[in-house]
Amino acid sequence: MAKNAKFRVPFRRRREGKTDFRQRLGLLLSGKPRLVARKSLNNVTAQLMSYDEKGDVVLVSAHTKELVKMGYKGHCGNLPAAYLTGLLLGKKAVKEGAEEAILDKGLHRATKGAAIFAVLKGALDAGMDIPHGDEIIAEEERLNGTHVKNYAESLKEDADAYKKQFSKYLEKGLNPEDLPEHVAELKEKILNL
């Protein structure tokens, strides 16, 4: 390993695969707060963060678990949940007076229609000003869950496959075909906060 002066050990967070310091420096030099969006398999987290010498400060945050408390019955890891999380974060940020930000996607690859960009679209719809390209954001029918509705309708013929695929939706009392209306209701509730 490190036997001579030519070998340089990377920073710990770089070794752990958590931080791209070159990208982080570019974002910090902008002087704007960062919209940090992270997705796991079952949840989406969004935070508005600003730099401080002692460590980053979270100005506002939103999580899909907050959506569940507001009455969301769908899966918390899908695109509609990511969009609603971004909308909730944007609404909170505008109330706090932070209307401008820059997207921090972390180590996620920039893929068209990804959940991180659904969070971005939600924050934009809440009134935030974030530089972006329109081609990277998913279509409106994916953000409101129409693709889930279409898939559920195509699977309806095979009752066993339908019940297996959408068991959690049915358990929570939400018919998957009603997801777009459910998302629209929750969107209205968030916008009226």
UniProtKB/Swiss-Prot annotation:
It comes from the Archaea. GO terms for biological process: ribosomal large subunit assembly; translation. Keywords: Ribonucleoprotein, Ribosomal protein, RNA-binding, rRNA-binding. GO terms for cellular component: cytosolic large ribosomal subunit. It holds the Pfam family Ribosomal_L5e. The keyword RNA-binding applies. GO terms for molecular function: 5S rRNA binding; structural constituent of ribosome. Signal peptide: none annotated. The keyword RNA-binding applies. HAMAP family: Ribosomal_uL18_A. Part of the 50S ribosomal subunit. Contacts the 5S and 23S rRNAs. This is one of the proteins that bind and probably mediate the attachment of the 5S RNA into the large ribosomal subunit, where it forms part of the central protuberance. Belongs to the universal ribosomal protein uL18 family. This is Large ribosomal subunit protein uL18. It comes from Methanococcus maripaludis (strain C5 / ATCC BAA-1333). The gene is rpl18.
